[in-house]
Swiss-Prot record:
Mg(2+) 1 binds at residues 27, 80, 152, 154. This is Flap endonuclease 1. Interacts with PCNA. PCNA stimulates the nuclease activity without altering cleavage specificity. It comes from Methanococcoides burtonii (strain DSM 6242 / NBRC 107633 / OCM 468 / ACE-M). Its cofactor is Mg(2+). InterPro entries: 5-3_exonuclease_C_sf, Flap_endonuc, Flap_endonuc_arc, HhH2, PIN-like_dom_sf, XPG-I_dom, XPG/Rad2, XPG_CS. It comes from the Archaea. Residues 116-257 are annotated as: I-domain.
Length: 338
């Protein structure tokens, strides 16, 4: 997912405390996908309730957002709306990848290959409509605001940061910069120790902050040229040019000025180029949202998680105690959130 331009961008590692009192517009689909990929058993099986319904995403929302809020972060979830028509090929390819990964996961499990199984299980992750509906409901009950974008969630989140309604976008993808996000924070919901693939080595994963202005200045390019570089490499809307990585794309765009000249020189073509470039520069966004963090509905959360999805009531209550202590306790605590 996204575009592979990360090696070109400046990154600063920070502690989570550095985001205290900051509003972060979180790319909901991207984050739910992360929860579904990471919150799994050793053989890759996701968390499920007694009816077989996957609950990894709900666990991530409750426990990881509670930890963020304890650290002073003010999260907003931004959900995707209708994707542009020219994203259909990418969505179809993702479906094929998931189907293939699911088959390989089942095969690896049958052979007792836990590490292989886990890898393929992660690649098989899928965010369904029911998962989104349950996620929205849980956010409402937890008192955390969410926004429904008219189209791409990253575009809406970028707009909210541009307006000053949020300080950062929270996403693992770099597409946010193509939509004009001033600042992005990565690894927000996956901070902690992570095992390296095929190695018995664990590394500390910390949040990374990236600035669009700083990266463009370092590269000596404009945002439009960054979009052109991404399109050379490949985006959610087009396949990249053969044998063109981010560094070569940067060189070509700086040398020729824009992607149209690059394509002419290479004898290549990108379908609907103008429409796709314009979509990055001028995506559909909305001002129809309200940002309020309110006291959680304890009974509602317990009903959704414990009665419907078999969560431990003791653990859920402990998480709610922590949540209420930070956004639902005294008036002075609440005042810090507005």
């Amino acid at each position: 997912m996204g575009t592979d331009i990360g090696d070109l961008l400046l990154k600063d590692t920070i502690e989570i405390a550095g985001l205290s009192n900051k509003v972060v517009a979180i790319d909901a689909y991207n984050t739910l996908y992360q929860f579904l990929s990471i919150i799994r058993q050793r053989d890759g099986t996701p968390l499920k309730d007694s009816r077989g319904q996957i609950t990894s995403h709900l666990s991530g929302i409750l426990y990881r957002l509670t930890s963020l809020i304890e650290a002073g972060v003010k999260p907003i979830f931004v959900f995707d709306g209708k994707p542009p028509d020219f994203k259909s090929d990418t969505l179809a390819k993702r479906h094929e990848v998931r189907e293939s990964a699911t088959a390989k996961w089942e095969d690896a499990k049958a052979q007792g290959l836990e590490e292989e199984a886990y890898k393929y299980a992660q690649a098989s992750s899928k965010v369904t409509r029911e998962m989104i509906d349950d996620s929205v409901r849980l956010l409402e009950l937890m008192g955390i605001p969410y926004v429904k974008a008219p189209s791409e969630g990253e575009a809406q989140a970028s707009y909210m940061v541009q307006k000053g309604d949020a300080d950062y976008i929270g996403s693992q993808d770099y597409d946010s910069f193509l939509f004009g996000a001033p600042q992005v924070v990565r690894n927000l919901t996956i901070t902690g120790k992570r095992k390296l693939p095929k190695k018995n080595i664990y590394v500390d994963v910390k949040p990374e902050v990236l600035s669009l202005v700083d990266s463009l200045g370092e590269l000596g390019i404009t945002r439009q040229q960054l979009i052109d570089i991404a399109m050379c490499v490949g985006t959610d809307y087009n396949t990249g040019l053969e044998n063109i990585g981010p560094k070569r794309a940067l060189k070509l765009v700086k040398e020729h000025g824009d992607i149209k000249v690059v394509l002419k020189e290479l004898g290549k073509d990108i379908e609907d180029l103008d429409a796709k470039r314009d979509f990055f520069m001028n995506p559909p966004v909305t001002d129809d949202y309200e940002l309020k963090w309110i006291k959680p509905d304890r009974a509602g959360v317990i009903d959704l998680l414990c009665k419907k999805h078999d969560f431990s009531e003791e653990r859920v209550n402990k998480a709610l105690d922590r949540l209420e202590a930070n956004i639902g306790g005294s008036q002075s605590t609440l005042d810090q959130w507005f």
